[in-house]
Amino acid sequence: SNDDTFYISSLSSKVILYKGMVMPKHLSKFYLDLSNKKLETSLCVFHQRFSTNTTPQWSLAQPFRMLAHNGEINTIRGNRNWSQARSSIFKTSKIPELAELKPLVSMKGSDSKSLDNMLEVLVVGGINLFKAIKLLIPPAWKSVPENDSELRAFYEYNAKHMESWDGPAGIVLTDGRFAACVTDRNGLRPARYIITKDRHITVASEIGVYDYEERDVLEKGKLGPGQIIAVDTQEAEILYSHDIDDLLKKRCPY
């Protein structure tokens, strides 16, 4: 269809996506679920933005199906073209009809929307969420001599299969089990986190999104360039950059 006004927010069986072109304080009135005390969740990814240089559109409102993005992908034209060029060689048993879904990413609209498309293709196709986002938004691994050989091999191997989506980026994402935040290799977008004693972790571009008493703070910090922090809701664990690096580099003999 050529109807640009129609957009499927999500078909996920693990997450519910609420989005709208409304003021933040009105979202719970627009979606009455959000006013129902019986509605509970272990994680929430949110995005709030007021359009400055573009006209608001339903299909471009964030969060998208897997991520919310604060930033700009400067390499978007090349990323889109490469995604289209290699779409014929993408194969996975999890999506038998993949060849019929071209183009795999939106060739127009926002850069964030296209990035979300590619992340969704990788994850639904069977790639681990952390590996998928590291393929797309890798750290500056070439210029970090202290990286161990296994981790360097991971990035070197995967760089041959996927070009990076570069630019200022602070990204939050989820697949329903994991919730994570990752920053670009230059750290051009802020990401600060707070962990409280009641087992809440909040990650946002600034402090103060979640109300808390200072005495209840267990840990606070910020992500450096190319770093990631995540929560595993199934195992009730917080994963830091070094934890995720260890998981990725040991999955295969890169």
Specify the residue positions occupied by each region the protein language model found:
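Conserved short alpha-helical segments that host acidic/polar catalytic motifs at enzyme active sites
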Residues: S1-Y254
